[in-house]
């Protein structure tokens, strides 16, 4: 027990005022007052405010029976808020602790909370916790534990526990300074005056959750809110005002994004309250947040203008209308007049021209000029489904992902269906497995602008540069996957990795080199072994007689074709040599050997 006499010089021992408002409460108030008097912390005062009780003096007689053990005040009836305000105006303490006349404090309620304050640097912190629910006779019903609903870190975000119904007013220990700075209870609100004031105070005050149960809250039929007919309407108005007053920054602090805050608030209101109007408002505001979210679509273009126009058109018909298109012309040599004409006609399209440096540099230029909250990538020969952005945006906002991808469909040069690729299953914490298997296709990707501003594409790599970036991002973040086809990837000759074993092999080798040269990623170098083996295996495709008949520009020289056929037999033993090299000389030496072989022979 801490007493004023025993107070050590280095122990914070402030005067705490316990305010007990009461109206016709003779049936329960003695238990409440006794629990206040039984506090193990002695530096307290007990202020009882009789709010004009009309019970033939029964309430007053109970209060007067305590003599000078309490400070007793009588006033005209004005409601609970007015009684609390009267107590606040007459309290002498540095801290306020509310005790309803029908509730009970555990003996250590005040001492325990003051002990917490002693451990905190900021003595202006509000302390709160859970409570025990009891019935009319005082029998325990259950324990209400906020930490079973939200993690501790969330419970210490000032407004969030209030807006999830987790704060009981009698569990609070509040510095009196906030009544002077923020104000007192709104007496015009018969049943919501507490939440109204807590909302105002908690917008500026820090809070600290403590898991100890320190109060007993009585549930009975005579409680004021149950007897006031317009209670639900008053609550609807109050909650609606909360939603309108909260800033974007406050919503982000509570739930990481305005959309998440609004949808989770709507869910809370729907599941736990009858406040339908406030719930509908939260849902409406959430939809508006999505509508107002701009997505930047980056399309690098190098020749093949007709396909680029098709790609642009697939964006223009999106069901989500708030987007911009950044066309990055990577030094095209074809006639681009039709493309530039389309760009000039739509203010949502911005055109950039640069010298040819490869798709990585083109995408990076787009990232540096994007203004959307999210970025989506679309290669100029690929297509979006019309609801691609809408579905992916909602998925990311709902699940708080900063990076996501989807399943997709392969099409041929004429746009005809080839097959579906269900890559969207690849999600969650996929690192380091993503090093050896990365199924993420470029036009399926969407991420936050901030993410890509901090993680640009490696411009020194022209094949496999996308996978290198996905690996880097996955090493630090969870990946969101949607197993729904939302993009079409065109499979064509010449420039497409799917059709070019050599390009695919070089891409795998580039990825391996990227991993090995990164200080962090290189710790997971064993995962690159399969990449090397896959690269060598792909070279076997060069033995295919039909391959030399393809229109792939790399092989349009007969001399090169003859060189390939001459050295193709090497691939039959190259896998075994690679395995031996890895075992004896390591991955770095092996990758260098393969790169030299490719440069020399292919």
From Swiss-Prot:
Entry's Gene Ontology BP terms: biosynthetic process
Classification via Gene3D superfamilies: Spore Coat Polysaccharide Biosynthesis Protein SpsA, Chain A
Gene Ontology MF, one: hexosyltransferase activity
UniProt keyword Glycosyltransferase present: yes
Keywords: Glycosyltransferase, Transferase
The enzyme's E.C. designation: 2.4.-.-
Disulfide bonds: none
Pfam families linked: Glycos_transf_2 (PF00535)
Source species, domain of life: Bacteria
Residue intervals passing through the bilayer: none
UniProt key word Transferase: yes
Family annotation (InterPro entries): Glyco_trans_2-like, Nucleotide-diphossugar_trans
Family classification: Belongs to the glycosyltransferase 2 family.
Descriptive protein name: Uncharacterized glycosyltransferase RF_0543
Organism the protein comes from: Rickettsia felis (strain ATCC VR-1525 / URRWXCal2) (Rickettsia azadi)
């Amino acid at each position: 027990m801490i007493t004023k006499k025993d107070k050590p010089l280095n122990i914070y021992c402030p005067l705490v005022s316990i305010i007990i408002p009461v109206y016709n409460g003779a049936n329960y108030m003695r238990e409440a007052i006794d629990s206040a008097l039984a506090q193990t912390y002695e530096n307290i005062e007990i202020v009882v405010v009789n709010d004009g009780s009309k019970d033939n003096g029964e309430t007053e007689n109970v209060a007067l029976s305590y003599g000078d053990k309490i400070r007793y005040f009588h006033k005209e009836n004005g409601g609970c808020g007015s009684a609390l305000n009267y107590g606040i105006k007459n309290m002498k303490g540095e801290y306020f602790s509310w005790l309803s006349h029908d509730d009970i404090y555990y003996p250590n309620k005040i001492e325990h909370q003051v002990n917490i304050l002693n451990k905190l640097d900021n003595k202006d912190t509000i302390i709160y916790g859970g409570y025990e629910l009891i019935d009319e006779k005082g029998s325990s019903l259950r324990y209400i534990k906020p930490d079973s609903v939200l993690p501790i870190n969330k419970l210490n975000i000032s407004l969030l526990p209030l807006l999830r119904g987790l704060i009981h007013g009698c569990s609070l220990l509040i510095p009196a300074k906030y009544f002077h700075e923020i104000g007192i209870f709104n007496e015009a609100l018969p049943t919501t005056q507490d939440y109204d004031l807590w909302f105002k105070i908690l917008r500026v005050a820090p809070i600290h959750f403590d898991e100890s149960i320190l109060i007993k809250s009585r549930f009975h039929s005579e409680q004021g809110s149950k007897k006031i007919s317009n209670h639900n309407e008053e609550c609807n108005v109050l909650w609606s005002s909360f939603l309108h007053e909260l800033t974007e920054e406050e919503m982000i602090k509570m739930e990481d994004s305005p959309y998440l805050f609004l949808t989770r608030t709507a869910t809370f209101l729907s599941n736990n309250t009858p406040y339908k109007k406030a719930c509908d408002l939260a849902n409406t505001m959430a939809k508006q947040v999505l509508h107002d979210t701009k997505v930047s679509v980056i399309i690098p273009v190098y020749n093949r203008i007709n396909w680029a126009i098709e790609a642009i058109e697939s964006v223009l018909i999106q069901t989500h209308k708030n987007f911009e298109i950044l066309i990055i012309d990577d030094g095209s040599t074809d006639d681009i007049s039709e493309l530039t004409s389309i760009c000039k006609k739509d203010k949502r399209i911005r055109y950039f021209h640069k010298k040819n440096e490869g798709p990585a540099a083109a995408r990076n230029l787009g990232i540096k000029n994007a203004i959307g909250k999210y970025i989506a990538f679309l290669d100029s020969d690929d297509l979006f489904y019309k609801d691609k952005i809408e579905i992916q945006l909602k998925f990311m906002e709902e699940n708080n992902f900063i990076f996501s991808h989807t399943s997709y469909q392969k099409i041929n040069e004429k746009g005809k269906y080839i097959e579906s690729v269900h890559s969207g299953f690849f999600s969650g914490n996929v690192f380091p497995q993503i090093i050896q298997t990365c199924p993420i296709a470029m036009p399926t990707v969407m991420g936050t602008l901030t993410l890509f501003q901090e993680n640009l594409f490696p411009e020194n790599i022209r094949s496999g540069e996308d996978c290198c970036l996905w690996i880097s991002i996955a090493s630090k973040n969870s990946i969101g996957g949607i197993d729904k086809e939302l993009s079409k990837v065109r499979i064509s000759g010449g420039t497409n990795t799917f059709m070019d074993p050599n390009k695919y092999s070089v891409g795998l080798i580039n990825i391996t080199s990227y991993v090995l040269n990164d200080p962090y990623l290189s710790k997971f170098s064993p995962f690159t072994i399969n990449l090397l083996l896959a690269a060598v295996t792909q070279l076997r495709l060069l033995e295919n007689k039909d391959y030399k008949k393809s229109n792939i520009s790399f092989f349009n020289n007969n001399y090169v074709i003859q060189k390939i056929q001459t050295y193709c037999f090497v691939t039959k033993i190259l896998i075994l040599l690679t395995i031996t090299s890895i075992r004896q000389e390591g991955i770095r030496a092996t990758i260098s050997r393969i790169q030299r072989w490719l440069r020399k022979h292919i």
